Amino acid sequence: MSLFRKREPPKVAVCFASPTMTRRAADWLGKLGGCKPIAILSDDCDDVVWQCVAERADLLLLGTDFSNGVEDKDVSARCDIAIEVRRKLPDCRVYLICEDGHPEKLPALEKAVELKLIDGYCIGDLDPQQMRTWLSETKEVMKAAVRPLQL
C-alpha cells in the first residue's frame, strides 16, 4: 500500500463570456485530454470563486470580452476574479483568453502578469500546444505542492 495518493489530472475550470462558449471550451479540453474540465456557466465573481473552491480547481481559464460596455469581462474585472480565486486556492494557476484585435489591452495584460495577478494569457484562439504547456506547468505546481507523509 502506498502512502501517496495518486493525483488526478489537473482540474481545469473554464469560464467564458457565454455559457455556450464555456461549454465548447470544456468540450475542447475534454477532447484534448490530460485534464478534467469543469464548465463554470456563471461569470459572476462570487460564483466563479465558489465553484473553483468547491471543485478544487488547479487551473482557471477566463475568457475576456473587450466589446464596448462590457466592463465585467475586461482585464481588470477578470484579474479581480483571479485574485479572489487565488486567495482561496493559492496554487491555482489563472490564464486569460483574450480576443484578437485589441492591442490597447496588451499593457494591462503584461502588467497583470508582472504583478502575478495571472499566470499568463493568450490572444486569439488557444491552440492545443499552448494548452498542453499550461497543463504541464500546472502539473509541476501540483507535484511541488504534494508533501510526503511524515511518520
Question: Where are the predicted features?
Answer:
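Non-catalytic signal-transmission and effector/linker regions of two-component phosphorelay proteins
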Residues: 1-31, 38, 127-151
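Alpha4 helix (beta4-alpha4-beta5 surface) of REC/receiver domains from two-component response regulators
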Residues: 73-76, 80, 93-122, 126
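Conserved N-terminal glycine/acidic-rich loop preference
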Residues: 3-8, 21-24, 56-60, 64, ...
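Acidic, metal-coordinating helix/loop segments flanking the phosphotransfer/catalytic sites
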Residues: 41-59, 66-69
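Short acidic, S/G/P-rich loop/turn micro-motifs used as interaction or catalytic elements
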Residues: 18-22, 65-71, 100-103, 127-128
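Conserved beta-strand segments of the P-loop GTPase G domain that flank and frequently precede/overlap
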Residues: 14-16, 60-65, 94-98, 122
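A structural micro-motif
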Residues: 10, 35-37, 92, 119
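Conserved phosphotransfer cores of two-component systems
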Residues: 53-55, 84-91
